[in-house]
């Protein structure tokens, strides 16, 4: 039998072993073995691209995987529910009576400090949970990890419901429930990104944000339904419904496949094949499934050569992980600095300030706009790409925030804040708040989760995603805690702060964030390792699809003047 024939009869796993053995001998020269092994662990040094790609099928073929990913994404609903309900709790009479303080005349109130702590401490719990509990996904699998963090979330809800009149008990409950949501925020997008077909990955990961908006909207509606009660029904019923959402999440995990990348990492090759086959609705022995498994195994085997991943590897610039970590943390931070939670956490309070008699109703309007707009976001993320959507989102939100803040500063109180507000100015502000929410929900709401979930190599993915997501929670805490103080001091001038952040976001995306639409996770990794310039990334072609005339070096440098580079795509 010839050598070529022998290779042709090898299984994908046997072929991979042969390739790895040969490449290992090449990479083992004494002079720079350690350096090359480190690079090889992230995919450099050899190319393991699937020879046969999984074909794109009609939309009806992806109904099953879409439903499964929506079940995983339901973790976002849990987070959104908290955001939608807490904004109403802090304005409900029974909640204020139990957890607030008393003026000298006997009236109850929540101080700015206590309000800020109750609202925002949830984010600190989320940041800690994202860093600590996301490790469960590497240890026991993404599915088991999600179930465990949901149970932790339930414990936090029990503590909150059991609170009678001690605000610090409620405070502790929010920290613990935040731990669970922090783990969910890392593991849900991670699992979706690893089970979804590459041409649907952006859409399906965006379903996590869709669930967040659904939770916010229904949370607003529940607050509206309970506001007329005079007892703890006002806030205990919305909290009690959290048990239903958590149990649905746990039940849904029994129907979804485990990450094929995790299964390959722990040696469960047959299960990895089945997971890929189920997600793409093809036979387990389909050549495209075998090729996909081989590509995944190549990355896993290369990672094993370098040993266990450490936290220190997140700061490696040689393998471009540090650059990716900074970009991921910045994208997540900037999502908060858009000012979205200024509306969502304090929506009820804001619209009282513009003179509305029932600000709960206005919050519902914002919730409807937010939820409906996210469907548009799910479409545009794959139609126009991550980078383009982020740029348009930053530009359009800037315009909306300028109008919103300017009207609030110059027209809302024409005769001073001690006089009635202008109804026309208030209506104008609500309209532009809705425009702003539309622009946010279609771009910066879902896309940061997509970008972060597909940026990092498997070897350090959970660690890197937890750090990037923690940056989001940290800024969420800062905005949630300090907003009452800032708005009390400068009122609607606060909008100009977010406007400045939005301008910065536009240029940051323009110069730093690459386009990853239509690429496998392994191809995204290769693009980062090749050092492709972000403004040329849309034209980058993976090694497996390059023609003879393709110039890879052209993607890594640009001799044009800066002003031309910024708006160049080639």
Swiss-Prot record:
Classify the protein's membrane topology as the record does: Multi-pass membrane protein
Question: What cellular component terms from Gene Ontology apply here?
Answer: cell periphery; mitochondrion; plasma membrane
- Residues the record marks as carrying a glycan: 91, 228
User: A single Pfam family, by name?
Assistant: Sugar_tr
- Biological processes per GO annotation: carbohydrate transport; D-glucose transmembrane transport; hexose transmembrane transport; transmembrane transport
Main location per the UniProt record? membrane
* PANTHER family recorded: GALACTOSE TRANSPORTER-RELATED (PTHR48022:SF75), PLASTIDIC GLUCOSE TRANSPORTER 4 (PTHR48022)
- State the similarity comment: Belongs to the major facilitator superfamily. Sugar transporter (TC 2.A.1.1) family.
Q: What is this protein called?
A: High-affinity hexose transporter HXT7
């Amino acid at each position: 039998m010839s050598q070529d024939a022998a290779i042709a009869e090898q299984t994908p796993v046997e072929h991979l072993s042969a390739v790895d053995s040969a490449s290992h001998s090449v990479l083992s020269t004494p002079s720079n073995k350690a350096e090359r092994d480190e690079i090889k662990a992230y995919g450099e040094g050899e190319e393991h691209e699937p020879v046969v790609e999984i074909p794109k099928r009609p939309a009806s073929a992806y109904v099953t995987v879409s439903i499964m990913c929506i079940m995983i994404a339901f973790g976002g609903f849990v987070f959104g529910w908290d955001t939608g309900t807490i904004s109403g709790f802090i304005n409900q009479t029974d909640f204020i009576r139990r957890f607030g303080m008393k003026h000298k005349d006997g009236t109850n109130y929540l101080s700015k400090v206590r309000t800020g702590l109750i609202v925002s401490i949830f984010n600190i719990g989320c940041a800690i949970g994202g860093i600590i509990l996301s490790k469960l996904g590497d240890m026991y699998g993404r599915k088991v990890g999600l179930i465990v963090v949901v149970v932790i979330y339930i414990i936090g809800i029990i503590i909150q419901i059991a609170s009678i009149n001690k605000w610090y008990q409620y405070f502790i409950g929010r920290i613990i429930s935040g731990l669970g949501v922090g783990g969910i925020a890392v593991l849900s997008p991670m699992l979706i990104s690893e089970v979804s077909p590459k041409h649907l990955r952006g859409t399906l990961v965006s379903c996590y944000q869709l669930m967040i908006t659904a939770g916010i909207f229904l949370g607003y509606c529940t607050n509206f339904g309970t506001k007329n009660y005079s007892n703890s029904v006002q806030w205990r019923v919305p909290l009690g419904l959290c048990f239903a959402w958590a149990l649905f999440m746990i039940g849904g995990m029994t129907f979804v496949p485990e990450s094929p990348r995790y299964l390959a990492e722990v040696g469960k090759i047959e299960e990895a094949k089945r997971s890929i086959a189920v997600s793409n609705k093809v036979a387990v022995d389909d050549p495209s499934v075998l090729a996909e498994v081989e590509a995944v195994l190549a990355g896993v085997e290369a990672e094993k050569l370098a040993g266990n991943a450490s936290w220190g590897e997140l700061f490696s610039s040689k393998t471009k992980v540090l650059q990716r970590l900074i970009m991921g943390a910045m994208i997540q931070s900037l999502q908060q600095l858009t000012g979205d939670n200024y509306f969502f956490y304090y929506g009820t309070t804001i619209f009282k300030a513009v003179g509305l008699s029932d600000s709960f109703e206005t919050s519902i309007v914002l919730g409807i706009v937010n939820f409906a707009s996210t469907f548009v976001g799910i479409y545009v993320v794959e139609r126009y790409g991550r980078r383009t959507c982020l740029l348009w989102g930053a530009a359009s939100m800037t315009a909306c925030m300028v109008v919103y803040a300017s009207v609030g500063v110059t027209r809302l109180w024409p005769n001073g804040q001690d006089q009635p507000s202008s109804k026309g100015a208030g209506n104008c502000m609500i309209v532009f708040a809705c425009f702003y929410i539309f622009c946010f929900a279609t771009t910066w709401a879902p896309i940061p989760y997509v970008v972060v979930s597909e940026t990092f190599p498997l070897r350090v993915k959970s660690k890197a995603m937890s750090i990037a997501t923690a940056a989001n929670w940290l800024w969420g805490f800062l905005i949630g805690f300090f907003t009452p103080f800032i708005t009390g001091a400068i009122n609607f001038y606060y909008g100009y702060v977010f406007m400045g952040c939005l301008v910065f976001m536009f240029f940051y995306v323009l110069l730093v964030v690459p386009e990853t639409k239509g690429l496998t996770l392994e191809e995204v990794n290769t693009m980062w390792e090749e050092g492709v310039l972000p403004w040329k990334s849309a034209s980058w072609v993976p090694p497996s699809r390059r023609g003879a005339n393709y110039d890879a070096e052209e993607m890594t440098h640009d001799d044009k003047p800066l002003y031309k580079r910024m708006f160049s795509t080639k």
